[in-house]
Regions:
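Cysteine-nucleophile active-site neighborhood
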Residues: 62-135, 139
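N-terminal beta1-alpha1 cap of cysteine-dependent amidohydrolase-like domains
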Residues: 1-84, 194-224
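Structural motif
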Residues: 54-58, 90, 185-187
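Amide-donor transfer/coupling interface in amidating biosynthetic enzymes
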Residues: 2, 122-224
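Short helix-coil boundary/hinge micro-motifs
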Residues: 220, 230-231
Length: 231
């Protein structure tokens, strides 16, 4: 078994140590005898989403998001097809905002990928601090650190979790993140996956299930039932 992880634009979207999330995925695959490789894509690179099993879209400043905005338009069609075919995506902070239709800032409008029906607008002040949420995906809470000026509205989409302590998407709704098909978006840093290995295992399991179809669907279910998130 093999998983290929695509890290989109880590030279620009790596504000909060997203390489730690890549390292976590690689290590947890290694521990389970799953071959894994990471491909880091820069702005000038062509991305073949059909060869990727997990895509990481990390966080960046508003300036850096503006820099990648034009490139995102070029990959939008292929990225959308990947998502609709149940491709696995983890998007964090700025990357989370870019999943939606737009991010409206004081400096202008950043057009998003339109992969998920959601949008973000800059609010007054930043939402900063430790955060704890409860997700329907796991028995144990998800924890991390948030630091964002954007207020995200996810419409009719399902949130990643309900905030137990902290701010979440907008500081008011009590929701944090978004889940759409096999896409997970969140404001949580930490890095996210080392702090929440159960989430890393979910991404790996879903990637295996999709790649190997019926055979690995059975294996993935067995893996989820026996994997300890802290092993």
């Amino acid at each position: 078994m093999k998983i290929t992880i695509g890290h989109l634009y880590p030279d620009l979207l790596n504000l909060y140590g997203d390489r730690g999330n890549i390292q976590c995925l690689m290590k947890r695959c290694l521990w389970r005898g799953i071959e894994a490789e990471t491909i880091a894509f820069e702005l000038g690179d062509k991305i073949d989403f059909s060869k990727l099993d997990i895509v990481l879209l990390g966080g960046g400043s508003d300036r850096e998001q503006m820099l990648v905005c034009e490139k995102l338009k070029e990959i939008q069609k292929d990225f959308k097809a990947y998502v609709e075919d149940n491709g696995v995506v983890i998007a964090i902070c700025g990357g989370y905002q870019l999943l939606g239709k737009y991010y409206k800032t004081d400096q202008g409008m950043i057009e998003g990928l339109k992969l998920v029906d959601m949008s973000t607008e800059q609010g007054k002040g930043r939402l900063i601090g430790n955060i704890v949420m409860q997700s329907d995906l796991f028995d144990m809470p998800i924890v991390g650190f948030e630091n964002h000026g954007g207020r995200t509205t996810i419409g009719n989409n399902k949130p990643l979790g309900k905030v137990l302590s902290g701010y979440g998407n907008d500081g008011q709704s009590g929701e944090e993140g978004v889940v759409y098909k096999n896409v997970i978006g969140t404001y949580l840093h930490g890095p996210l996956l080392p702090k929440n290995p159960q989430l890393a295992d979910l991404l790996i399991s879903r990637a295996l299930e999709k790649k190997y179809r019926s055979e690995e669907r059975r294996v993935g279910k067995e893996c989820r039932s026996r994997w300890s998130p802290y092993h």
